């Protein structure tokens, strides 16, 4: 049973931040897929608040409390599901370690592992994420490029 889409932090930010360059694209994607359910997890929620409240992100960055309020407003959507971090990073590495090449893939690796575990898909705009899986792997079906 498919359990929907885990939004990576970039998709989550683009969804909630109208000035984001991919806001329209993500909104269109969500209009087609929201009924299948979309999810966040502690990692993506924390990263959302951290990034949205960073002045380097935008001259209009929010205070952390306001960023958390924006997050809460979005995860209040009826199609949203919360996925707990049910896996240790070592459990994810059992499957994905052979393809993990650099420090910038660590978070992506965990999110992909969580999506696979939940029988959902990781929704991302990062075209490199499928490379965490072997080229002809059926598990590449767990990645949804937005």
Question: What is the role of each PLM region?
Answer:
Residues 7, 106-107:
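A generic structural signal for residues located within well-ordered alpha-helices
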Residues 18, 39-46, 68-100:
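Acidic catalytic patch
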Residues 12, 45-48, 129-130:
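A generic structural signal for short hydrophobic patches within well-formed alpha-helices
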Residues 26, 107-108:
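Amphipathic coiled-coil/heptad-repeat helices and related helical stalk/stem segments
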Residues 33, 74-75, 115:
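A generic structural signal for well-ordered alpha-helical segments
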Residues 1-40, 52-69, 137:
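Short, well-structured N-terminal submotif of metal-dependent ribonuclease cores
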Residues 88-101, 109-146:
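Acidic, PIN/NYN-like endoribonuclease modules and their adjacent C-terminal/linker elements
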